[in-house]
A protein has these predicted regions:
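Short beta-strand segments
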Residues: 51-53, 167-172, 194-197, 248-251
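Short, aromatic/basic amphipathic alpha-helical patches
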Residues: 179-187
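Extended, low-complexity cationic-aromatic segments
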Residues: 30-131, 139-145, 256, 260
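RNase H-like polynucleotidyl transferase catalytic core
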Residues: 76-82, 188-205, 221-223
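Acidic/histidine-rich, metal-coordinating catalytic segments
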Residues: 131-152, 164-177
Length: 296
């Protein structure tokens, strides 16, 4: 779309149109999406763990709608009068390749609560990972970091001295996730943050595991206090980690969709398609048909 349209005037001025910053033909969110998808598909195979972080909630200690296990014909009944028992949020750190979850129910999740919790969890996790024993020069080390900023229009500045890259962290593009103190701490411990684009929280697999945990813990229940909700969430997380399910980005369903898309036949003049090719009459046959019609 042109940044300065010549048609459709707006009163005494020109009509406004949406333009993109810089000299780009594509959305600026594309590189962020591609980096996160590449991390999900290839990083673990290269020995680089990928973690996702998110905060779920707040969830109120009130009767929660949803299905519940009840005898047939005896639905669960919640009181129509109740007292609000406060709210709970769930801090979640998730490793999709193994399915393991580190979670902490809290009353609220400002930076003063989130940052120390995340630092403690990452410190404990990094201590369990195999350390890098092969000496690597500074140029190779920086290249391993900068490859995860490839194509970004506004990448954050990496420190001058970088340790070996040990993990990737996918989380939302929030101001509290970009404080200089936290970003410097992550880089100092070998963790590269990957931020989801605006409106791209669906790229964070922590959203999926949180939905599963919360649905199992409180949907269809009637918690009366925040402590009760915290106990339920903690128990569900403990049960999940007893037999975790690994997550895979895309998977067989995405491959089937891609094969179905490849089998389609695009139509000219629109974005439509057909599932089988349309028979086209050759030019020679068409000319003979027109000639015969004129002769008759």
């Amino acid at each position: 779309m042109a940044s300065q349209p010549h048609l459709v005037p707006d009163r005494h001025g020109r009509a406004s149109s949406e333009g993109r910053p810089g000299h780009r033909d594509r959305s600026a969110d594309g590189p962020q999406k591609e980096l996160i998808e590449r991390a999900y598909r290839t990083a673990e195979q290269l020995g680089l763990p990928v973690f996702c972080q998110d905060e779920a909630g707040p969830y109120q200690a009130i009767p929660q709608p949803g299905p519940a296990w009840q005898p047939s014909g005896v639905p669960v009944r919640h009181p129509h009068e109740y007292v609000r028992g406060g709210t709970v949020k769930l801090l979640t750190l998730f490793r999709p390749a193994t399915g393991q979850v580190w979670a902490q129910p809290v009353d609220h999740a400002p930076n003063t609560v989130l940052h120390p919790w995340l630092q403690d969890e990452l410190t404990a996790i990094l201590a369990t990972l195999s350390p890098t024993t092969v000496p690597v020069d500074a140029v190779t080390t920086r290249a391993a970091w900068t490859i995860w900023q490839e194509g970004l229009s506004q990448p954050f500045t990496l420190p001058e001295e970088l340790p070996p890259l040990r993990a990737l962290l996918v989380w939302d593009n929030l101001a509290g996730h970009k404080t200089p103190e936290l970003v410097c701490w992550l880089c100092a411990h070998g963790v590269m943050p990957l931020y989801t684009p605006l409106g791209g929280s669906w790229l964070n697999l922590a959203e999926s595991i949180q939905r599963i945990l919360v649905r199992r813990a409180i949907v269809g229940q009637h918690p009366t206090s925040t402590n009760e909700m915290k106990d339920w969430l903690t128990a569900i997380v403990r049960g999940w980690n007893a037999a975790p399910t690994p997550f895979e980005w895309g998977g067989k369903r995405a491959a089937r969709r891609q094969r179905a898309h490849d089998r389609r036949h695009a139509l000219g003049g629109s974005g439509g398609c057909t599932r089988r090719p349309i028979a086209r009459r050759c030019r020679r046959t068409l000319s003979h048909t027109i000639g015969d019609h004129r002769a008759n």
